[in-house]
Amino acid sequence: MEKLEKLNPLFYPKAVAVFGATDTPFKYGNLYMQAIIHRGYPKEHLYPINPNEKQAFGIKAYPRVQDVPEPIDLAIFTIPKKLVKQSLRDCVEAKVKFVSMFTSGFSESTSEREEGKKLEEELLEIIAQSNTRIVGPNGMGVYSFDGKISYPFMYHPPEDGPVSFISQSGGLTVELASMADFWCDIRFNKIVSFGNAINLESTDYLEYFAEDPKIKVINMYIEGVKNGPRFFKALKEAVKIKPVIVWKGGRTEAGSRATLSHTGSLAGSNKIWEVALKQAGAVQVYSMEELCDVTMAFLRIPPPKGLNTAILGAGGGRSVVSTDELESAGLIAPSFSPEIKEELSKIVPDVGTGISNPIDCSYFVYYDLDMYTKLIQLMDRDPKIDIILLQHEVMWGDRNEHLFKVIKEAREQTEKSFVVVLLPSAGPRKYTPELEAERLKILKQYLNEGILIYTSMHRASNAIYKMVKYYKFLELQEKPEEEVFAYSKLHKK
């Protein structure tokens, strides 16, 4: 609980001051005020700090933070770099708990790196003997659904979710919040964009979210860390409590150079990062899409007991490539048990079909939904199967709605991990924007019901495999060393 108490005022501030607040459109002091007010933060505890303004957004402005009538938990700097030092001194004098610095031009600046580093050191000297802590500089700051805090360009969904995002990039947090909500129905409870991290760093937020009962999955985008041993120690502890999904920036030589000019971070050796993340038990991803895919798996299905996956689809070629994609990702498509195979042979016609795994029933199965239901029930009964995966295409007429109802009921009746892959094929129809819109409508329908759904076998298989690997890692922490070695030899991915 110590970490929660330490950072709670940052995510649940009782009073907020915005340095540089103004009514002038398109200035960041204006945009931050807009975002915070739009998020619903109470105006009576929101204080514009600007000696050149009498008010902002109808709220009285103060020339100095020392002049406001209550203690400030969070100050947000949207001011020029030349004003930062004195403003920080004012915050220390006023006993402000946290200062979030959007201001840039520090060690990340290519043209002024040495000067920027020196300025960062001076900022640390200013807060050295105080309880004031810095988020940033060069970071967007904090989003907190319950704390009603936000920043410019941020998407504000009407509901929150059990996910947090720790990011060195501000722009990626804005992109992820919007994309994750639209495509995956993932929403965030808390986000922090911490930029150069001269004071508080990724490890502090990781420790906080590990203890936060509102957070079920932790997402991270990091380019580098100041204190590697401390970070990986915190990471090892966090993954014992909840999944931590890490997207590491700067993996290539060119990407590593880019991190230096983005946040002033040294990205470090990619191979060392890969090994260290694996040893810590983190789930490593390589894109925003993959981050969403894996997060969605953790939120929507119970932990699979193993890798064995039953596939129900249509088409011989599709069955072949689906199996290739599934096993290439690390999952397994085993043969069904003899008794289940016998039951399948009684149901599935023997022309143009197959009853191995995948089950290929050709397209007529979508017109015999009683058979479709029985096939799912048989897959569910097979003790060898851990995961049920159904793939289907956008259908004709009311077939989509009927199929959805059958799949929804089947999912409610199984305790196994249950996944749908929605393919784009138009069959005899020309693929048009209208057909893609229909596919999106179906996708959202499944998402709204809490069903795990992907748009390709590759994305589904990859996400689920990484989920299984995480839970296997947790299991192996309790097992003898020889069992751990045997597992690592079998699953080298």
What does each model-found stretch correspond to?
Residues 1-493:
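Catalytic-core regions of core metabolic enzymes
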